[in-house]
Curated annotation (Swiss-Prot):
<dbReference type="GO" id="GO:0001510">
    <property type="term" value="P:RNA methylation"/>
</dbReference>
<feature type="region of interest" description="Disordered">
    <location>
        <begin position="505"/>
        <end position="542"/>
    </location>
</feature>
<feature type="binding site">
    <location>
        <position position="726"/>
    </location>
    <ligand>
        <name>S-adenosyl-L-methionine</name>
    </ligand>
</feature>
<feature type="region of interest" description="Disordered">
    <location>
        <begin position="837"/>
        <end position="856"/>
    </location>
</feature>
<dbReference type="GO" id="GO:0046872">
    <property type="term" value="F:metal ion binding"/>
</dbReference>
<dbReference type="InterPro" id="IPR040870">
    <property type="entry name" value="HEN1_dsRBD2"/>
</dbReference>
<dbReference type="GO" id="GO:0005634">
    <property type="term" value="C:nucleus"/>
</dbReference>
<dbReference type="InterPro" id="IPR056755">
    <property type="entry name" value="DSRM_2"/>
</dbReference>
<dbReference type="Pfam" id="PF21224">
    <property type="entry name" value="Hen1_LCD"/>
</dbReference>
<feature type="binding site">
    <location>
        <position position="796"/>
    </location>
    <ligand>
        <name>Mg(2+)</name>
    </ligand>
</feature>
<dbReference type="InterPro" id="IPR046357">
    <property type="entry name" value="PPIase_dom_sf"/>
</dbReference>
<keyword id="KW-0479">Metal-binding</keyword>
<feature type="domain" description="DRBM">
    <location>
        <begin position="19"/>
        <end position="87"/>
    </location>
</feature>
<keyword id="KW-0949">S-adenosyl-L-methionine</keyword>
<feature type="binding site">
    <location>
        <position position="860"/>
    </location>
    <ligand>
        <name>Mg(2+)</name>
    </ligand>
</feature>
<dbReference type="GO" id="GO:0035279">
    <property type="term" value="P:miRNA-mediated gene silencing by mRNA destabilization"/>
</dbReference>
<dbReference type="GO" id="GO:0009909">
    <property type="term" value="P:regulation of flower development"/>
</dbReference>
Amino acid sequence: MAGGGKHTPTPKAIIHQKFGAKASYTVEEVHDSSQSGCLGLAIPQKGPCLYRCHLQLPEFSVVSNVFKKKKDSEQSAAELALDKLGIRPQNDDLTVDEARDEIVGRIKYIFSDEFLSAEHPLGAHLRAALRRDGERCGSVPVSVIATVDAKINSRCKIINPSVESDPFLAISYVMKAAAKLADYIVASPHGLRRKNAYPSEIVEALATHVSDSLHSREVAAVYIPCIDEEVVELDTLYISSNRHYLDSIAERLGLKDGNQVMISRMFGKASCGSECRLYSEIPKKYLDNSSDASGTSNEDSSHIVKSRNARASYICGQDIHGDAILASVGYRWKSDDLDYDDVTVNSFYRICCGMSPNGIYKISRQAVIAAQLPFAFTTKSNWRGPLPREILGLFCHQHRLAEPILSSSTAPVKSLSDIFRSHKKLKVSGVDDANENLSRQKEDTPGLGHGFRCEVKIFTKSQDLVLECSPRKFYEKENDAIQNASLKALLWFSKFFADLDVDGEQSCDTDDDQDTKSSSPNVFAAPPILQKEHSSESKNTNVLSAEKRVQSITNGSVVSICYSLSLAVDPEYSSDGESPREDNESNEEMESEYSANCESSVELIESNEEIEFEVGTGSMNPHIESEVTQMTVGEYASFRMTPPDAAEALILAVGSDTVRIRSLLSERPCLNYNILLLGVKGPSEERMEAAFFKPPLSKQRVEYALKHIRESSASTLVDFGCGSGSLLDSLLDYPTSLQTIIGVDISPKGLARAAKMLHVKLNKEACNVKSATLYDGSILEFDSRLHDVDIGTCLEVIEHMEEDQACEFGEKVLSLFHPKLLIVSTPNYEFNTILQRSTPETQEENNSEPQLPKFRNHDHKFEWTREQFNQWASKLGKRHNYSVEFSGVGGSGEVEPGFASQIAIFRREASSVENVAESSMQPYKVIWEWKKEDVEKKKTDL
């Protein structure tokens, strides 16, 4: 979407704006077995997958029809829900006068006999108001009507969009509407009640349904002082079934009654998942002149600014004045019972943490101290936690921004097949420079064919542009472009939360600042700095660990660790920061005392039995990552550091005993880290190669094989270890002399994918191929049906076997299968040093022995150097009367360390081959078979 004009919200976006996290979508797969994805496939297969969506809202649920796409089923369910709610997307087209009239009509209906027994939360408030005593009997606080009733609140926003952030405006519009119902409604300065009493039979009937389950109850809440210097404290509310809970809250705030209490929107979550609200005093300016919310004097404005509660306003996104109480208590749909949950100081800090992109990620990973929002999205398989697009949507919802608009586009990009030719020589010592140059070129022009870009635009609810993010990079997959653009936007927003988010020295992504722009720096306001509850003296991070070693785990690896973090007072320092006195006579006594003090001054704040993260993307606390990358699997490490001031809010967000943690934070504490490295998965072979080669090595290998197929005029081809059929599928994209293609593999899943791809292409495209067959079998077994073919291929397969099995395959394929031409490729182990950057400069500085590079894939059983590969192929060819030619793809054979993927071409020299009876040995099972004559016959029959 170009420009900043209005866009029509989708049904799902409207549901999200109305209900947020309370709207739960569950999509189920519906398989259509009546249709077949691939005729002739011997493996049991599912039909096309369809989707049905179940949408659960607080008061009801709906089920969509069946659709081919998940998103269509979700939109359908949302549309059904809107119909059931009576919400019309065109409500935004209402005029201000029409909105005012609808508020009047809605208030009249709320105080009708019919609505008194409604299952709406406001109905429960009305019934509770009838149990109030004295002049308050039947009086409903005006803030309840303005906040709890969604229809009234939405109409108030039509009158003035500022209602979104200023709830007091909604109160004024409700009071103005009530003034037009003087014959029906009695309006006090703070509440509304019906002029004529409800019929006695209705009231008596309702009285019999009052729950006795809540006689009196203490509910934990959080008291947030207006003055920033004062500490946020745990508080207690006393609520009961015979008293309106707002009167109890008013009592704690020092107010006359609940009519003077302002209620915020729902936000955040308490310990058990219930959402919270803020309760505060309606500013006197509004109490004294509630019928007119405009035209404040300078004196009034000054008072309101001074009374604004910055911390409370920040966590709910609305203007809160005076002291406030954070609580989870209120009425829900379809219930007369008061719903409540304890809210702790820990809950308050978790809500604060969850307002930022980094905090959302931390909480979702259940690692508030250890985890960090990554600064790079590499692959979906390596990403842990919610995806960037999901986090961005949640962030926008929390800050009352419109749904992000993501627009993907494709564009042709030029080839980079000559990248290596531009570098005369690649040396191990020049790895970093080479990587930097190649990476820079890769970002601008990612490869042959088409690439994807994604643009993100974020608007306010009133359609003011907040952020436009247009990354220049292209990506091979559309989802990668979407996730990277979303992450860019999140990183831009993260700059506003530096004081809340940063754990020590966190790197920032500043390479693409030119990709993002904002129409005004004031559109999105930075959050208030949380008051440092202790000394504001700067704290330097000191990691006390063993001497720094060489990094042994490469970037792109996914590691699994077990860790625990504890807060402890350093026994070497007294509370005033001075070293303890030395007294030889009392050393033993002091040592015992320090040991006891240390033991009693340790608080476990966070632990995780197993968590995974990708190295080199900033997804983990830098101190943890730095230590882990120097470890080996099974190794245990521990170290300590002094937490920076910015980490105090995070520590309070995870600690269970806030009082004790605050006490420790005042005693110059340190963070004790204990880490066990459970496992390491190296960066994927595809990713490492993609960082250096465009087009990818896999495509270069296919092109190399095609060249020899054309030169040999082969008519039959067998792909040994065909996997998902990528080579066979690619062969159909080019004109060749091939008439018969065969694939062999031991993976039924891979063969099924191959069959589906080949089935589609062979039936749609005109080509010379007359037959195609896929076999389930081991290439270590001989099958006479594959004897004496024109060409055999075995690309990047043998390294997945044991080394002796690879040698066995070589013997059998040349002695029994006896192809005229055989192409075998395997990784060049010597090239791994460049791909993995496994020789950092610090090795020379530390005079340590160079580390051996790792295999390119965790599934590889071995990888050969050029010498090993040459010896294997040469001896094999000599024994079986084959000439051998060596080549490769990726890089150059004339410079060190040779080709990235080394290739041997075996050519049969003997003109005559012994005949083998076709039925003599046939261990392979036919999984799928296609014949051109069968297809043509069916067409003729039709």
